[in-house]
């Protein structure tokens, strides 16, 4: 049977337009090609990384414009201005976030203000608001979710084989949202937030929610325990996460860098077009990959579409390496993950309140004395990315009266 020539022409035109769109997008971000054909980023400074994420962030803001317009004016009262923060009175507390609540809306809004878009997480997830109990303002955010299956620096540290990783990865999580909001970030609040990963509160919450996790493939109970949490700096090397120690306890340890592979330079709108292209070809990666639709699936789907279009595999290597850290909640975490034997040693695992007190004395109060500029911060400045015409805030003296 002869194929209709018009169908072939339409497919070729679609491919040509899609290939052109990919090339033009990468060029707009400043990517070039080396003599060997490898993709080259325009640099690796923090400003360059923010610029590379700009289109992805713009898409995220646009997609959430209605939500921002409806909720920001009512939720702004939970964001602090500098003059509302009294450093020696700061009292950090954790609140776990549940879906469908105003706390969930607050988490979503706060995450949208960051210059590098955050993931929504995959699989198992625990989200937290970190409050300043002294004034009812938001200090920062924590969210942990399922880790990626392949992470070389993590796997080399633990020293497990493929079988061990498959059976014991359930005891690991990844912090996909982690950071402090202004003005607390100026007081090194990011260090406080990062230290809270290694808290008894997270360990116990995980045990309650996921302790009886059943494997998707094996359908067997995993008896999961939160032994360690990884996280990755969004800005290359992290000055916030490095040397995080309190009273001799190491809260985060740098274990190396990612290989510079990923899909952040392919925005959602372009990914959808690539996926639709695969879908029309009945490609297996278009709608699912094996037992999930997490980060590996999106990476594989994008890679598959680019390969079909004739691009090289190395188009997924953007070259931006990110520093990887691990927080070991149990002193013997790596040993248990490697061998599957032993009970977690939690003798040095403190409560969030105890950790917060140490972090306040170690970093935040001294920083407030050395750098009093945090007092100049205005909560409204956090929403500069929103058009004044689309967002109407109540007068300053009415913000405290606004009801969620």
From Swiss-Prot:
What is the protein's known function? Component of antiviral defense system Druantia type I, composed of DruA, DruB, DruC, DruD and DruE. Expression of Druantia in E.coli (strain MG1655) confers resistance to phage lambda, SECphi18, SECphi27 and T4.
Q: Which InterPro entries match?
A: DruA
Pfam families listed in its UniProt record: DruA (PF14236)
Which organism was this protein described from?
Answer: Escherichia coli (strain UMEA 4076-1)
Q: What is the protein name given in its UniProt record?
A: Druantia protein DruA
* Biological process terms in GO annotation: defense response to virus
Q: Which gene codes for it?
A: druA
Q: What are the leading ranks of the lineage?
A: Bacteria, Pseudomonadati, Pseudomonadota, Gammaproteobacteria, Enterobacterales
Key words, A-Z: Antiviral defense, Cytoplasm
Localization per record: Cytoplasm
């Amino acid at each position: 049977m002869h194929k209709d020539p018009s169908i072939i022409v339409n497919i070729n035109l679609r491919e040509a337009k899609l290939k052109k769109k990919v090339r033009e997008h990468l060029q707009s971000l400043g990517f070039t090609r080396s003599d060997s054909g490898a993709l080259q980023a325009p640099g690796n400074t923090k400003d360059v990384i923010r610029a590379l994420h700009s289109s992805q962030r713009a898409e995220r803001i646009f997609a959430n414009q209605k939500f921002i317009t409806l909720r920001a004016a009512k939720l702004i009262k939970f964001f602090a201005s500098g003059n509302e923060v009294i450093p020696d009175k700061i009292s950090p507390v954790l609140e776990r976030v549940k879906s469908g609540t105003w706390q969930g809306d607050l988490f979503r809004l706060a995450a949208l203000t960051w210059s590098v878009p955050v993931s929504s997480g995959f699989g198992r997830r625990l989200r937290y608001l970190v409050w300043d109990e002294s004034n009812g303002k938001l200090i920062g955010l924590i969210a942990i979710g399922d880790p990626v299956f392949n992470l070389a620096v993590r796997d080399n540290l633990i020293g497990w084989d493929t079988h061990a990783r498959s059976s014991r990865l359930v005891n690991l999580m990844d912090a996909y949202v982690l950071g402090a909001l202004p003005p607390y970030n100026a007081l090194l609040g990011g260090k406080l937030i990062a230290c809270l990963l290694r808290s008894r509160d997270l360990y116990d919450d995980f045990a309650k929610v996921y302790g009886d996790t059943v494997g998707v493939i094996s359908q067997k109970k995993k008896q999961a325990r939160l032994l360690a949490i990884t996280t990755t700096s969004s800005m290359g090397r992290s000055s916030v996460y490095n040397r995080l120690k309190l009273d001799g306890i190491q809260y985060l340890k740098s274990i190396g860098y990612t290989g510079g592979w990923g899909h952040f330079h392919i925005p959602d709108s372009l990914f959808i077009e690539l996926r639709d292209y695969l879908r029309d070809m009945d490609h297996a990666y278009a709608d699912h990959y094996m037992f999930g639709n997490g980060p590996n699936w999106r990476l594989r789907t994008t890679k598959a579409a680019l390969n079909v279009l004739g691009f090289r595999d190395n188009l997924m290597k953007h070259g931006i390496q990110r520093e990887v850290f691990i927080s070991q909640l149990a002193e013997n975490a790596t040993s248990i993950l490697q061998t599957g034997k032993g009970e977690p040693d939690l003798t040095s695992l403190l409560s969030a309140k105890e950790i917060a007190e140490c972090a306040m004395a170690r970093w935040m109060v001294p920083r407030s004395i050395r750098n009093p500029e945090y007092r100049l911060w205005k909560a409204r400045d956090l929403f500069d990315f929103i058009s004044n015409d689309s967002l109407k805030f109540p007068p300053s003296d009415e913000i405290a009266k606004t009801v969620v």
